[in-house]
Each structure stands twice: as C-alpha cells, then as structure tokens.
C-alpha cells in the first residue's frame, strides 16, 4: 500500500511548509493542496533560486511529481494563470504536471470586491484578510450559489449562472458598501478566455487518490496557513475561511480519512502572526526586532511585516491534539542564533490568577492572558546551514529536546536555512 503524508502548519501560518513539502516530494508521486487559495505564500529556495507559489502545490518543480489542486481549494483563474505563465517562462511544463478538481469553487472579481469592501467597513476591527476574495468565495460555496471549475464545461449555462450571481453581489456592493459594481461582461470574457485551459486539467481527484493508494504510490498533502487559523479551531473570528487542520484533508481532497499514515506538523522555532488577532507571546522591542529582521518576517503573499514572539508551546500543543501529529519539522532554528536567552511559553495565567495549560477557543478568551515562560540559555554559535544533528550547539539541542518534552511529539526534521539542502531529516515521514 502507498503512504499518505500530510504536511501542515501548527501555528498561525508562515512556518516554512513549502520548503519541507518540496524536500519530501523527492519520494512522492503526487502533491495535493486541499484547502485555502492564493492567500497562501509558499517560498522555495533551490540552489539559491527563489520561487514563491500561492496556489500551485510546491511539488510542481519536481520532474516526476504530479501536483493536484483538490476540491477544498478556492481557485482564482487569473491567479492560477499568472503562476502558470511565470513558471512556464522558466521552463517548467506546468500543464503536464498539474491537475484540478472540477469541484473547486472559483474566486471571481466580485469576491475580491466584497472582501476589500468589508475590510474597509470594519475599520479598526478589520480581520486583516489578504483581500483576495477567499472568504466570500467560501461563503458562496456554503450558500450553494458558487460557480465551480466544472461549470466551465458548459459555457452557455455558466454565463447564465454568472449573470445571476453578479447581480446578487452587485446589489450588496453598491447599496450597502457604497462600492463600485462589478462588470459582468468583463468577468465573463476574462474567465471564458481561459476556460479550456482549466477544464483540460480536470480529473476525478478522489478516484485518482484511491487508486494511487492501492498501487502503492506515495502522496503528499500540502496544507496552507496554520492550525490556529482554522475556521473552526482557530482564534475565531481572526481566522481563515477553511479547515487548515488534518481533518481538512479528507473533505478537501476526497481521500478516505483512514488512509492518512503520517501527519507532519511544521513548527517555527519562535512564533509569528500576520494581521490582527490574539498573540500572547508577542515581542515588541529588541528581541522582536531580531526575530523580524533575521527571520525576514515579511509575508510572501502580502509583503506585510509579521508580528513576532517567543514559541507558544501551549498553542502548539493544541495543534498536536487537533491534528494527531506524528512528528514535527522545526524550522528557522538559525534565527535564534546569537540570543543570550530563549523563552518557551508553557502555560497561561488568567486575569484572576488561575493558571491553565490549554488555549481558549474564541479570540475573546485570549484577552488578558499572561504567558508563563520557561527560560533557557541561548547560543552564540551559528546553526545556519548545519546538516549534522551532532554538530548543533548543546544549547540548541537542549532547546529542541525541551520542545519535544512540552509537546509530547518528536522532532523528525530540522531546518537550518531556506535552501532545500539545509535540512536534517532524522526520521523520514514516508518511512515512519
């Protein structure tokens, strides 16, 4: 039988999933995106060359790997074409390596218009979305009015459905948000111009994955964002609009849940967050600046500066529970080089003085939480690019061991730099 490995983020996204997926796909036949949209930003560095992917799975650069966009992904046709064009200009035969589910909901210009109009209307209470129409597209999906990739097979019917939904959303845009209406004809023309390209890549994803499993193929499932941004389990309402957790694999791809063999949680050696929302361990002064600059903490999708803080092991433990993690990949360990001391949050103190070791479910419950820290010695030696576990400074090894102890999960992979080669694989998920 084949092995199905899930790679997902355990924090608020930006943990370094793209690099890890790219590394592990050396042994995979398929790489599958199962949720999110082009709000993701997965950065790959291979032999010094940087590639940023937002929608196409990170396995696309591998010659013998087929990349799949599953039904749980909301797909923006213009964003997909932009990525395809950029990759093809570099000699990557995208159309030979990429497949789509016909059940992918389409993100169209009215979704983007609604996203931005709503954020503007929220003012100081804005969620901090990427403004790419992700949430409104998922809303249309759940309301059963959304258009999907499969609708493009019948262009005449697509045009009729599109007209109805444009009128529906324009009423809200113009009358409630006082924003400009979306031009139906332009939307139709733009989508139909690339419809045949999209439909040519359509496949029955669930059937493909089932047969791949029976054949013994290795499959990698690539998560986007992070566990703490999950629509159900994250810091609601400061969350994304999809299930970023392991449960999203089955619903977002059609793979039977019992076929998942290993779940790899990507955990950054410290914490970051983009946009608004709770962040108990956030740092604002010298150490926060160190993490931000040395870690190059600027969003691959939006360019926004990420908020930075100490590792929150309480939040990561929540990710362990929800995802039934098999192991961790620890990323950006090298960013901690040079710090005299390093802290790990192992609990919270409530405003009434009570100590707790779990995260609240809603954002309101995080208000007034005081992190309870353990302080460990830092290290002055460089860990950048180290590929031998035994060559790491003892203080770094102690830090790694403590993360394993407080989370109850082994660290199977350690990343010490952005390049594919700057990685230590202590236990390969496909062999676990």
From Swiss-Prot:
IMP binds at residues 14-17, 39-42, 130, 144, 225, 240, 304. Keywords: Cytoplasm, GTP-binding, Ligase, Magnesium, Metal-binding, Nucleotide-binding, Purine biosynthesis. It catalyses: IMP + L-aspartate + GTP = N(6)-(1,2-dicarboxyethyl)-AMP + GDP + phosphate + 2 H(+). It is found in: Cytoplasm. Its cofactor is Mg(2+). GO terms for biological process: 'de novo' AMP biosynthetic process; IMP metabolic process. Its EC number is 6.3.4.4. GTP binds at residues 13-19, 41-43, 306, 332-334, 415-417. Mg(2+) binds at residues 14, 41. InterPro entries: Adenylosuccin_syn_GTP-bd, Adenylosuccin_syn_Lys_AS, Adenylosuccinate_synth_dom1, Adenylosuccinate_synth_dom2, Adenylosuccinate_synth_dom3, Adenylosuccinate_synthetase, P-loop_NTPase. SUPFAM superfamilies: P-loop containing nucleoside triphosphate hydrolases. PROSITE patterns: ADENYLOSUCCIN_SYN_1, ADENYLOSUCCIN_SYN_2. Substrate binds at residues 300-306. Coiled coil: none annotated. Its main location: cytoplasm. The keyword RNA-binding does not apply. CDD domains: AdSS. GO terms for molecular function: adenylosuccinate synthase activity; GTP binding; magnesium ion binding. Pfam families: Adenylsucc_synt (PF00709). Binds 1 Mg(2+) ion per subunit. Gene3D superfamilies: Adenylosuccinate Synthetase, subunit A, domain 1 (3.40.440.10), Adenylosuccinate Synthetase, subunit A, domain 2 (1.10.300.10), Adenylosuccinate Synthetase, subunit A, domain 3 (3.90.170.10). It comes from the Bacteria. Plays an important role in the de novo pathway of purine nucleotide biosynthesis. Catalyzes the first committed step in the biosynthesis of AMP from IMP. Homodimer. This is Adenylosuccinate synthetase.
């Amino acid at each position: 039988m084949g092995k199905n490995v899930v790679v997902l983020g355990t924090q608020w996204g930006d943990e370094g999933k793209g690099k890890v997926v790219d590394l592990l796909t050396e042994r995979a036949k398929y790489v599958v995106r199962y949720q999110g949209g082009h709000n993701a930003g997965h950065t790959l560095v291979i032999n010094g060359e940087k590639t940023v992917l937002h929608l196409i799975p990170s396995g696309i650069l591998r010659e013998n790997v087929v990349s799949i966009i599953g039904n749980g992904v909301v797909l923006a046709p213009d964003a997909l074409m932009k990525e395809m064009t950029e990759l093809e200009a570099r000699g990557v035969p995208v159309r030979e390596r990429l497949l789509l589910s016909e059940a992918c909901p389409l993100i169209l210009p009215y979704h983007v218009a609604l996203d931005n109009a709503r954020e503007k209307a929220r003012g100081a209470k804005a969620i901090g979305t990427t403004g790419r129409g992700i949430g409104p597209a998922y809303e249309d999906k759940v309301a059963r009015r959304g258009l999907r990739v499969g609708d493009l097979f019948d262009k005449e019917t697509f045009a009729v459905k599109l007209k109805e939904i444009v009128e529906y959303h324009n009423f809200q845009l113009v009358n409630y948000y006082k924003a400009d209406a979306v031009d139906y004809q332009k939307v139709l023309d733009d989508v139909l111009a690339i419809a045949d390209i999209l439909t040519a890549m359509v496949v029955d994803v669930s059937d493909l994955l089932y047969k791949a499993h029976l054949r013994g193929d290795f499959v990698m499932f690539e998560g986007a964002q992070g566990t703490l941004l999950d629509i159900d389990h994250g810091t609601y309402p400061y969350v994304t609009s999809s299930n970023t957790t392991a449960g999203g694999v089955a619903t977002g791809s059609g793979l039977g849940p019992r076929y998942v063999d290993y779940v790899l949680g990507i955990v950054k050696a410290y914490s970051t967050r983009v946009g608004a929302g709770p962040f108990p361990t956030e740092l604002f002064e010298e150490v926060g600046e160190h993490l931000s600059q040395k870690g190059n903490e600027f969003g691959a999708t939006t360019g926004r500066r990420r908020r930075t803080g100490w590792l929150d092991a309480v939040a990561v433990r929540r990710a362990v529970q929800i995802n039934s993690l098999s192991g961790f990949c620890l990323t950006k360990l090298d960013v901690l080089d040079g710090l005299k001391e390093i802290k790990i949050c192992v609990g919270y103190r409530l405003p009434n003085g009570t100590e707790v070791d779990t995260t609240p479910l809603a954002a309101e419950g995080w208000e007034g939480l005081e992190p309870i820290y353990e302080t460990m010695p830092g290290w002055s030696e460089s860990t950048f690019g180290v590929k031998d576990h035994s060559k790491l400074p003892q203080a770094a090894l102690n830090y790694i061991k403590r993360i394993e102890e407080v989370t109850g999960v082994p660290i199977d992979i350690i990343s010490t730099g952005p390049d594919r080669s700057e990685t230590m694989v202590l236990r390969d998920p496909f062999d676990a």
